Amino acid sequence: QKPFFLACGIYRPHMPWQVPRKYYDMYPLDKIQLPNVPEHDLDDIPPAGVRMAKPGGDHAKILKTENWRYAVQAYLASIAFADVQVGRVLDALDASPYANNTIVVLWGDHGWHLGEKKHWRKFSLWEEATRAPLMMVVPGVTQAGTKCDQAVDFMNIYPTLCELCELPRGEHLDGLSMVSLLKDPAQTWERPALTTHGRLNHAVRDNRYRLIRYQNGDEELYDHSQDPMEWKNLADDPQYAETKERLAKWFPAKNAPDAPHDASLGQGKKKKQQQGKGKSKKKSAQP
């Protein structure tokens, strides 16, 4: 009779990509398909975007060491491992008395580049880094196997849960309830998804376009109906001026300052190790 909330964080596919061998074996190296990365992909990217991508960093190292296929294999193996762990949680729920009155939300906090646009990790405003899974099961509301193609962002999760659980929603929240989409995935949704990486760097994504604007005003625009890999930057094309203006209205009117950084955090262990140096000449029996 008492409501409960359970948060279950599954660490993979976060680095390091170390999982049992059987998950690597699911993806033989000779079957791995590497991303298609045009040699001149970054030529039409503004300097701010290139700096964020850092093609001379991770991607250059991956190419030099010839580890691209190994990296993709390890990422896929980590996802397969995570999938099994999700299954364990859901199996336990299905076997419990709460299977038919528990809302399930499965989501990942960000995507990941595996060399697309000569970039690795997250840390960008492109599709690969900003698109992530979002799945919801609401007994009596959602239908199994349905898919919603609307672009939404994670600010909407909490307001959605508030409405579903009949809880008061704080007026300070920027997100919107997605209950209408859960009931009807084809429902009209006018608000595009907003992503921020670093202060004053934003991307707005609707069902067709992605508009990126960096802190210095540099822009990128991609038409996903024609260019799903974001290879052609349309930001300087005059015929898309109206599209840019429409999407730019969704950029934040205000930008909160960065959170204060406490330089002392994480220094305790290091300080303790430094203090312990030279106190004993006795060799440790441990490796």
Where do the model's predicted regions map?
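Histidine-centered active-site microenvironments of extracellular/periplasmic hydrolases
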Residues: P16-K22, M26, D91-Q143, Q150-D153, ...
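Short beta-strand segments
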Residues: F5-R12, I103-G108, M135-M136, A193-T196
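C-terminal cap/loop subdomain of S1 sulfatases and analogous C-terminal strand-loop tails that border
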Residues: H110-E116, K122, T142, D153-H224, ...
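A long, amphipathic alpha-helix that forms part
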Residues: A60-T102
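Active-site regions of oxyanion-processing enzymes, predominantly non-cytosolic
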Residues: Q1-E39, D94-I103, E242
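Core domains of carbohydrate- and sulfate-ester-processing enzymes
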Residues: P16-L63, K272, K281-K283
